[in-house]
Amino acid sequence: VYFVLGIILIWVSINVTNCTDGVDGLSGSLCCVVISAFTVIFANELGYYVIADFIFVATLLAYLYFNSNPSSMLMGDAGSRALGFYIAIIAMKTVHPISYILLAIVLIIDGGLGLVKIFLKRFLKISILVNTRTPLHDHARKNKGWSDTQVVFRFIIMQIVAAMIGYIIISLL
């Protein structure tokens, strides 16, 4: 059972992270917050992964320096999928892999909403959120009129708040 759930977690994490990579700095920033949250909360359980986490965050920060709007360097599918894979692996290394939902909720909602919408339409012939563009960052930019910078900063703020709430919930378990 754990193997199947692990495969599902990896698939979801890879795809939602990839779907989030559409605005300069968004996916990298959100992944930086998520990896940092896992590192802070589960430092004792992650062991040597803490060093890898610091390397990932340092690399992401250097990347974000050049990826801020307007970007001079792009991550692409290879980078965003690798980040999603790594986040899934560190989530499974903890004693609470369900913590992925708490600590990566903005990634899940932004990227996952489109996956759910497509799945329901293609396989179940159910149309939901017809007036909502997916991924959600596109809806914020094109339907709500947010600039790229506003999208990135507002999503980062939401992710930081979600990580803090996740920390409180996980510490109560």
What kind of region is each of these model predictions?
Residues 3-6, 10-173:
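Alpha-helical transmembrane segments
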